[in-house]
């Protein structure tokens, strides 16, 4: 085997071991700063740390759903039901 072929074979075998600039995350930290993420979470649904949770802001005290958007029912004797749309389930309040 010629020297050139041997060098090409060695380079091809070592190519998977090489690291490139495109390996790993393009933006360190995932692209969304945690301060912005927590602020958006507080504005949408509140959290325990801010003291503005939906349960405290809901006048009836009855909420439906555990994932955003969480609904505030009109009355406390309502119950939650899930209805299926085309691609996902949506919580609704059913009041007798």
From Swiss-Prot:
In which compartments does the protein localize?
Secreted
Top-level taxon of the source organism: Eukaryota
List the molecular function annotations (GO) for this entry: toxin activity
A GO CC term? extracellular region
Record's keyword terms, sorted: Cleavage on pair of basic residues, Disulfide bond, Secreted, Signal, Toxin
Q: What stretches pass through the bilayer?
A: none
Which tissues express it? Answer: Expressed by the venom duct.
What does UniProt say about this protein's domains?
Answer: The cysteine framework is XV (C-C-CC-C-C-C-C).
Protein name in UniProt: Conotoxin Mr15.1
Q: What is the lineage of its organism?
A: Eukaryota, Metazoa, Spiralia, Lophotrochozoa, Mollusca
């Amino acid at each position: 085997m010629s020297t050139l072929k041997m060098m090409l074979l060695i380079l091809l075998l070592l190519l998977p071991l090489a690291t490139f600039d495109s390996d790993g995350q393009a933006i360190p930290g995932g692209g969304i700063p945690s301060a912005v993420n927590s602020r958006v979470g507080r504005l949408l649904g509140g959290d325990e740390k801010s003291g503005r949770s939906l349960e405290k802001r809901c006048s009836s005290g009855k909420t439906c759903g555990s994932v955003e958007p969480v609904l505030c029912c009109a009355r406390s004797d309502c119950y939650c039901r899930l209805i299926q749309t085309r691609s996902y389930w949506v919580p609704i309040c059913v009041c007798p």
